[in-house]
Design a protein with these regions (language model features):
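Preference for long, well-ordered alpha-helical segments
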Residues: 150-190
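Iron-sulfur (Fe-S) cluster-binding segments and ferredoxin-like electron-carrier domains
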Residues: 47, 85-103, 176
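Alpha-helical scaffolds flanking conserved acidic
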Residues: 64-72, 152-153
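Short, thiol/selenol-centered motifs that function as redox-active sites or metal-ligating centers
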Residues: 71-91, 160
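Acidic interhelical loop/turn segments
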Residues: 134-154
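A contiguous pocket-lining binding segment that forms or flanks enzyme active sites
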Residues: 105-126, 146
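Amphipathic, charged-and-aliphatic alpha-helical interface segments
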Residues: 71-75, 116-135, 159-160
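Secretory/endomembrane lumenal or extracellular ectodomains immediately following the signal peptide
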Residues: 1-67, 100, 178-199
Length: 199
C-alpha cells in the first residue's frame, strides 16, 4: 500500500471531490479513478496542478490519444514504474485496442515493428525519460522526418515529461499495481481496470 492514504470521495472536501470527479468524467464508477490523483488529494493545491497538467497533456492537444498512451508506456517502462506500465497496458489493450504482442514488443523496447510515426515518437519519448540532454539535431530530424513538426515535438515532450513526473510521484509514494482493489473496496466496481493516467 502507498505511503499515504488514498483520499476517498466521502472523506474529501468539496473542492477535492470536484477535481477528482472532473477526472473521472461522466461515466462514474472506478474505471477512470486515478490512484495517483487520490494520493495527491492529500495536498489539494498539488492535486489541482497535477490534474490540470494531465488534463491538458493527455486529453488536450492535437496528437491523438493512441500515440499518447504509447508514449506513456514507453516512458513508464524506461523508468521501471510497474504501476504506471500496468495502468497504461490496460489503456492500450482496452481503449486503443493494441494487440497484446505489439504491447509486449513496446514494453521490451522493440520499436522496429511500429509504424514510422509511432517508432519515432517512442524513441523520442524514451530519450526524454532516460537522457533528455542527449536530444540533439539528429534526434529531432528523425522525429520531423516521421511527419512531426515543432508543435508536435513540444507536445510529445509535454506528454513524456508529464509521465516522467507521474512515474516519480507513483514510485516515491509506493503506489503499487495491487492497491486499486483495496483503495476502492466498497466503492462502485462495475468496471475493472484503470483508464486515463498513472493510477
Amino acid at each position: 500500500m502507498a505511503h499515504v492514504e488514498y483520499v476517498r470521495r466521502e472523506d474529501a472536501t468539496d473542492h477535492v471531490s470536484e477535481i477528482l470527479s472532473q477526472w473521472e468524467g461522466e461515466g462514474g464508477g472506478t474505471v477512470n479513478r486515478s490512484l495517483l490523483l487520490d494520493a495527491l488529494a492529500n495536498h489539494p493545491a498539488l492535486l489541482e496542478g497535477m490534474y490540470t497538467l494531465l488534463d491538458r497533456t493527455i486529453r488536450g492537444g492535437r496528437l491523438d490519444r493512441d500515440l499518447k498512451e504509447l508514449v506513456s508506456v514507453v516512458v513508464s517502462q524506461a523508468n521501471d514504474c510497474a504501476y504506471c506500465t500496468a495502468s497504461h497496458r490496460e489503456n492500450l489493450l482496452e481503449i486503443v485496442s493494441m494487440p497484446e504482442e505489439r504491447f509486449e514488443a513496446v514494453r521490451a523496447g522493440e520499436y522496429d515493428a511500429l509504424p514510422e510515426h509511432e517508432r519515432a515518437a517512442a524513441r523520442f519519448a524514451e530519450q526524454v525519460a532516460l537522457d533528455p540532454k542527449g536530444i540533439d539535431e539528429e534526434a529531432l530530424d528523425t522525429l520531423y522526418a516521421a511527419g512531426f513538426d515543432e508543435e508536435d515535438m513540444v507536445e510529445l515532450l509535454g506528454v513524456a515529461g508529464t509521465f516522467v513526473a507521474a512515474n516519480t510521484y507513483v514510485d516515491a509514494l509506493s503506489i503499487q499495481p495491487g492497491d486499486r482493489e483495496e483503495a476502492y473496496a466498497g466503492a462502485e466496481t462495475d468496471t475493472a481496470g484503470d483508464s486515463d493516467t498513472d493510477r
